[in-house]
Amino acid sequence: MPAAAPDIRVRRIYEPPSPDDGVRVLVDRLWPRGLARTDARIDEWPKALTPSTQLRRWYHGPDGAYEEFCRRYEDELSAPAAAEALDRLRGLAAQGTVTLLTAAKDPSAGHTSVLVRALSETQA
């Protein structure tokens, strides 16, 4: 019988924590503006899984294209530190709900969609 798909959710960090969140993981490189660390209630902040500063600046610059951003971010996720952090989150997701938290206005777009896809893939 195939394993159940992991329960990976994406929410804005500015939303109040929910009892259904499970493990709360901040997936932004920078701390969210205007949010006290005590209010965030995060369990993990794996900066190795966040887009690099260079990639983030490129994407928000005049030449940034979403498809190319996704490709470059996927490349970054194959780095050893990122791969180790992905494996850790996959393990947590196998045990229960993992909620990825971002300050982005549209939490289902941007790097979180790439990260959800990477976390949902089984390791070969």
Where in the sequence are the language-model features?
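Residues lining hydrophobic/aromatic ligand-binding pockets adjacent to catalytic sites
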Residues: 1-124
